[in-house]
């Protein structure tokens, strides 16, 4: 079969990542404006960036000072190529110093919510926004003079140049972070850059994503076959549905029952997903294999990598069986990898490896499959929209996120069958009560964690007990890059706690995790 032509690339905004905490959020905000965005490292040569033919470029914030030795730099060429550029925070200061402006280390630091005074209300970025507006600052250096040819459009009480514009060269910058919700009119300012400054039209949709991926998948797979691991979660389900739309019966889904799933998960996969898609499904019972491999292991990184390794080995076995049954080569493995997975596994410049995800950093080096990752550049909310567009039912699309390694990384300590059964019971109670209270759509997810290596004293009945604590970790988020703990009603928390301590053996304490992300990740391991 001849190869299909490469999918036409949409107008693309490049987000240059200087190691900013919010670099991924910038990309997401651009996409919310229905313009496609991609992230590139600041170490990429400018010529290589321009070779991507970007419709616009955004320079992210970053932790460095523009005067620090070894601080990220950019070739001046990026500002002279005729491509619209928007600098934020560090990107703003880098634009200023590169083009002849002045940035000083004045000691006048601004962190958090700050009043911005707009002096040019009719400017490209600020038209239609208030003259006084709260913005989110995070900087130590300050711009005291704009480059020649730039108009200063805003200031703060301590920073004389908090925003500037050069409409002729289509160069714009702000000292603050317009991408965070604390900058009340930040999205409007960003859209003004995209639509007015860069002249882009809001045309990127989930339909575009589906069409592009279908074409790319068909080109990649050709006449060969693919298998996809279904985990019971949203990501793998949407990835499988998207690949099936592209190659139909050339896809076989494999559900690995590794014994680390929640209560009723296997039955739900067989019932909901197969009924919705009609996909070919092979179920593999691998509980004993996984528990044997995890025996005696408490280190979370080691657990993740063992689960990733065994997952692939089971797939290789399933591959051989599918070939024996159906003939053509199974050369591809479909994975529901998302943008945050890649970032947290060290995929962004200037960012640390927070944890290895089983479908990113946890794969063995001798992997025998070529990967298909149709969701790799999408955030969770975008994945849900793609799922809805593909016709998947709400029972699948609106499910709360659940990690591929399953309950194996919600047990702090060694994973055993007894501990899994205990955690399954507690998790089922929490999910049941959250659903009964109508809170499923109010929270992003609620991991239930067993502190298996910890015991606490309790009193149950007339006797002293020495049982395990269970941790509830309800969080609210838009994309899993940042999260806040959810303020659940006390009555709901009380019901969950009472039921768990009454109904689950060896648990005598339920605690609530009230940590945001950062500093804590959503999952405990």
Swiss-Prot record:
Function: Catalyzes the synthesis of GMP from XMP.
NCBIfam families hit by this protein: guaA_Cterm, guaA_Nterm, PRK00074.1
Domain Glutamine amidotransferase type-1, first and last residues per copy: 12-203
Biological pathway: Purine metabolism; GMP biosynthesis; GMP from XMP (L-Gln route): step 1/1
Broad class of enzyme this protein falls into: ligase
Keyword list, A-Z: ATP-binding, Glutamine amidotransferase, GMP biosynthesis, Ligase, Nucleotide-binding, Purine biosynthesis
Gene Ontology MF: a single term: ATP binding
Gene it is expressed from: guaA
Name of the molecule in the record: GMP synthase [glutamine-hydrolyzing]
UniProt source species: Streptomyces avermitilis (strain ATCC 31267 / DSM 46492 / JCM 5070 / NBRC 14893 / NCIMB 12804 / NRRL 8165 / MA-4680)
